[in-house]
UniProtKB/Swiss-Prot annotation:
This is Sphingosine-1-phosphate lyase. Pathway: Lipid metabolism; sphingolipid metabolism. Residues 76-539 are cytoplasmic. Its EC number is 4.1.2.27. Residues 1-46 form the signal peptide. GO terms for cellular component: endoplasmic reticulum; endoplasmic reticulum membrane. It comes from Oryza sativa subsp. japonica (Rice). The lineage of its organism: Eukaryota, Viridiplantae, Streptophyta, Embryophyta, Tracheophyta.
């Protein structure tokens, strides 16, 4: 002991003697600078590991370039030009907005004003990808039904369950009917599926991610959560990551454009809270290998969310009709939550979606309970406090009026037309279909023409398709609107391809140059800034 003390004293004296040559300020600053350098190196290493060395170096280079005199002003001016072009030549509705209340109420004139505004909308009947999922003569009766249901409950709010017991029951029945479609009757699901209605697919996804984060924090003590998604997963997962401070590990799709299970496995670590599979994914209409992802989730004891926002009211019926649909719901071991939109193929009013959980233990982590508020005790199941009971009633009316037979009939029509469109696209020289579509989304690209120029020609013919990237492509989300005009779509598409082949190059007012440049631009931060500028100018 004495030897150790003696050694420590001699070490102290030697250190003091050595350090006595330095100014006190140096002794104070040196460890602080060393700490700063260590933190900078750690942050740089983390950025490289997360985004890649090339991306980090490019971002640093762009930051340095923007510091040069005049460069930043030039970039801002060019961004303004692009935003104006995206807004159809700079035309904005903000210049015609009503900004003050009328002095005297307009009474019934408001209906005339609304009709005038509505007349400015794009003619969506038949030529929009997705967007409106019912059309034709039967749509008028369907809209009338759900509008009447909405009007009966337009004053209700399920936040006040003690007052509006009817709406609470309607929501419970919508959730239960949906759970019955997605596996609650199968023993493998555990029979405890539960959930809530939300305002749309994004809120359902936000809640599933938040719930998984809190559940895994309670279960495993994870405080630096990470989730694994395929690059084809919906952008709502990035929104959830930003909202809830979750690190995203984005995995490239495999050669079939599906979630790469091996890539997912490589990303799993002690901070992983969840994985995401899509059925189908929005870009290409392909169902990820949910069973294999479920095996991973079970093996590593993490959550697995299945995004059924598009497929929830098609896949169960397509499977019954004999289409080769791979497993996608709670029948798959490892699936802990599912999101599905009623306002798409469920034909409910816009603003209705459902988030489901495997059991109540998981769902409890979705709720927010507040005990210290002077306004009393408070608990809310979803992100919104007040919710429109009219939308819940509209969803209930849509589902119960159509029934199993109605959904089966609709699914049969759109699945048949989807396959015809797929085959028709494959027959057009210069086009190819991406992957093997499982459902009603058909994505296609070209190796001989600029597909975005094709999109501009299609837009001039009244079609509204979705532009995709990596690879540059388009897709059409087939709905009941298209069942009677799919031949017109294929004819217009072939004519558009022929036009671009004969006269390559952008058309006046087209967006092909913007989409093409955005896809090739290496600085994704610049693209992000453009999107933010566009949104700020648009709303």
């Amino acid at each position: 002991m004495e030897l150790a003390m003696d050694f420590a004293l001699r070490l102290r004296d030697a250190a003091n003697h050595h350090l006595s040559r330095y100014e006190p300020l140096v002794l104070l600053a040196a460890p602080l600078l060393a700490l700063l350098a260590a933190r900078t190196l750690h942050a740089a290493a983390a950025a490289v590991a997360d985004r890649g060395l090339r991306t980090v170096l490019l971002a640093l280079a762009m930051t340095a370039i923007k510091l040069l005199p005049g460069v930043s002003a030039y970039i801002n001016a060019e961004k303004r030009k692009v935003v104006d072009q995206l807004q159809s030549g700079g035309t904005s509705t903000k210049s015609t907005l009503r900004t003050e209340l009328p002095t005297v109420g307009l009474s019934n004139q408001v209906i005339n004003d609304l009709e005038t505004l509505k007349a400015r909308d794009v003619n969506w009947q038949g030529k929009c990808s997705g967007t409106v999922y019912i059309a034709g003569s039967e749509s008028e009766g369907h809209f009338a039904l759900i509008n009447k249901a909405y009007s009966m409950f337009s004053h209700t709010n399920p936040l006040h369950q003690d007052v509006f017991k009817s709406v609470a029951q309607l929501e419970a029945e919508v959730v239960a009917m949906t759970a019955a479609l997605l596996g609650i009757k199968e023993k493998s699901s555990g029979g405890q599926i539960c959930g809530n209605m939300t305002s749309g697919g994004t809120e359902s996804i936000l809640l599933a991610v938040k719930t998984s984060r809190d559940y895994m924090r309670t279960k495993k003590g994870i405080t630096k959560p990470e989730m694994i998604i395929a690059e084809s997963a919906h952008s709502a997962y990035d929104k959830a990551a930003q909202y809830f401070n979750i690190k995203v590990r984005r995995v490239p799709v495999n050669k079939e454009f599906l979630a790469d299970v091996k890539g997912f496995k490589r990303c799993i670590n002690g901070n992983t809270i969840m994985m995401v599979g899509s059925a189908p994914g929005f870009p290409h209409g392909l169902i990820d290998p949910i069973e294999e992802l479920g095996e991973l989730a079970s093996r590593y004891d993490i959550c697995l969310h299945v995004d059924l926002c598009l497929g929830g009211f098609v896949l169960p019926f397509a499977r019954k009709l004999g289409y080769p649909i791979p497993p996608f719901d709670f029948c798959v071991k490892g699936v802990t939550s599912i999101s599905t939109d009623v306002h798409k193929y469920g034909l409910a009013p816009k603003g209705t979606s459902i988030v489901l959980y495997k059991n109540h233990e998981i769902r409890k982590h979705q709720f927010v309970a507040v005990t210290e508020w002077t306004g009393g005790l408070y608990v809310s199941p979803t992100i919104a406090g007040s919710r429109p009971g009219g939308l819940i009633a509209g969803a209930w009316a849509a589902m119960t009026s159509l029934g199993l037979n109605g959904y089966m009939e609709n699914t049969g029509h759109i699945m048949e037309v989807s396959k015809k469109i797929q085959r028709g696209i494959e027959d057009i020289p210069g086009l190819f279909v991406i992957g093997k579509p499982d459902m009603t989304v058909v994505a296609f690209g070209s190796d001989s023409v600029d597909i975005f120029e094709v999109n501009d020609i299609m837009s001039s013919k009244g079609w509204h398709l979705n532009a995709l990237q990596r690879p540059n492509s388009l897709h059409i989300c087939v709905t009941l609107q298209h069942t009677v005009i799919y031949e017109e779509f294929l004819k217009d598409l072939k004519d558009s391809v022929d036009t671009v082949k004969a006269n390559p190059g952008p058309i006046s007012g087209g967006r092909a140059p913007i989409y093409g440049a955005a896809g090739k631009m290496p600085d994704r931060g610049m693209v992000r800034e453009l999107l933010v500028e566009f949104m700020d100018a648009s709303c």
